[in-house]
């Protein structure tokens, strides 16, 4: 099957593989590997996509992800892609100054943060990022700063998409999606100067499957 955009990939795989395992993640509290099926993956991505619409995310908007590797990262990626959004990953060890530079350069409104370090770093520079409106926290164990009145947890974000209230908007955006849409901006480490944003389109990921 030929794909023109990453937004459709998870759902087509779910149609094909259903309840087969798509990925596993490690629960460090129980030391168990937790499976996620293709159907679960697809359903969660659809819910995340609807939550993005509820949040007010626009097509081609830049969404930041400042986190360790987590399954939530996939849901944000593919949920954003369904809205023709662009995701921008941060190094999990980025300093507050590095995060501030990327947020301001990419004009990020919504930043997903993983654990306590990422949250603390992002909150410390919130007031220096004119575009930044909200942090969305993956890990429920993260303790929010008492002064923080805008951040929400990931489960609260996902609740905004429960029941797929904006699915018609999502489907319209996905229908407009193009092979040449921007998928990610990857910032370099900045060891020889300010980080540079490398622009990767959906075609960069999909072309290897076509050859």
Summary of predicted features, one role per range:
Residues 82-160:
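Structural core segment of the AMP-binding/adenylate-forming
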